[in-house]
């Protein structure tokens, strides 16, 4: 069994190759950088929630979803939701849709201009 240090070294090597190894650490070029990014993003969300209160924070999330639906159009938003619903921990929604023969029109994901 790998020790904690060996595991961290392996994760650090994967992070340096561009893989996200820490949830919320997207963009970090090392394991430590990804950990710091994830922590900062989490704290930012908690701080905003404290400022707005739970109801206000939920309202902002709802408005964001509505805005995105308006930008993409109803069909594109539904297609994106369908693909998100197919996603699993191991496979993206696109991979699962392809495997299961489900037709998802990704051209509708574009923002309307």
Swiss-Prot record:
Using the UniProt annotation, give all residue ranges assigned to the region (Disordered).
1-113
Expression induction per the record is: Up-regulated by abscisic acid.
One GO BP on record is: response to abscisic acid
List, alphabetically, the GO terms of the cellular component aspect. Answer: cytosol
Q: In which tissues is it expressed?
A: Expressed in embryogenic cells, somatic embryos and seeds at the later stages of development. Not detected in leaves.
Bias (Basic and acidic residues): 1-17, 32-52, 65-77
The entry sums up its family as follows: Belongs to the small hydrophilic plant seed protein family.
Q: What is this protein called?
A: Carrot ABA-induced in somatic embryos 3
Organism of origin = Daucus carota
Gene symbol of the encoding locus: CAISE3
């Amino acid at each position: 069994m790998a020790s904690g240090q060996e595991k961290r070294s392996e994760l650090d090597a994967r992070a340096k190759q561009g893989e996200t190894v820490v949830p919320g650490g997207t963009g970090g070029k090392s394991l430590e950088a990804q950990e710091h990014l994830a922590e900062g993003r989490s704290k930012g969300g908690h701080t905003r929630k404290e400022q707005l209160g739970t109801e206000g924070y939920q309202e902002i999330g709802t408005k964001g979803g509505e805005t995105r639906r308006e930008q993409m159009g109803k069909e594109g938003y539904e297609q994106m939701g369908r693909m998100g619903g197919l996603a699993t921990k191991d496979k993206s929604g696109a991979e699962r849709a392809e495997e299961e023969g489900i037709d998802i029109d990704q051209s509708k994901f574009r923002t309307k201009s």
